[in-house]
Regions:
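Generic structural signal for well-ordered alpha-helices
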Residues: 22-27, 47, 75-82
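Catalytic cores of alpha/beta
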Residues: 38, 42-56
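Short, well-ordered coil/turn segments that N-cap beta-strands
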Residues: 30-35, 55-57
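C-terminal helical cap(s) of enzyme catalytic domains, especially alpha/beta-barrels
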Residues: 11, 15, 68-91
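Contiguous, function-dense segments enriched for cysteine-driven chemistry
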Residues: 18, 33, 45, 90-92
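Histidine/lysine/aspartate-rich catalytic loop segments that bind and position anionic ligands
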Residues: 1-28
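Conserved, mostly hydrophobic/aromatic
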Residues: 50, 62, 81
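Glycine-rich phosphate-binding active-site loops on the catalytic face of alpha/beta enzymes
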Residues: 1-10, 55-74
Length: 92
């Protein structure tokens, strides 16, 4: 699922609309017995909402992690992102 429109949404109304489109796409993928992955534009501030969607099996977040790693180191950048994703996934 391409999450770019969600990531680039301006304002709460547009973000909610794009989030709901992602939720619907994940549901349709699940109904078709597809393995659903999601990503594009996800970063430390917006990943938790997407990661909390039941049915997503993998997130693609590379750019944000590498950008953060420039300042904090790769291990810390990955650890921080993993903590955010795990926290959100626990709410599923």
């Amino acid at each position: 699922i391409h999450t770019g429109a969600y990531a680039e949404a301006l304002g709460v109304t547009e973000e909610d609309h794009e989030f709901n489109r992602v939720v619907e796409a994940v549901a349709r993928g699940g109904e078709s017995a597809l393995k659903v992955n999601a990503g594009h534009g996800l970063h430390y501030e917006n990943v938790e909402r997407i990661a909390a969607i039941a049915g997503i099996t993998e997130l693609n977040i590379g750019h944000s992690i590498i950008a953060r790693a420039v300042f904090s180191g790769l291990a810390e950048a990955v650890r921080e992102m993993k903590a955010r994703v795990d926290k959100a996934a626990a709410r599923r």
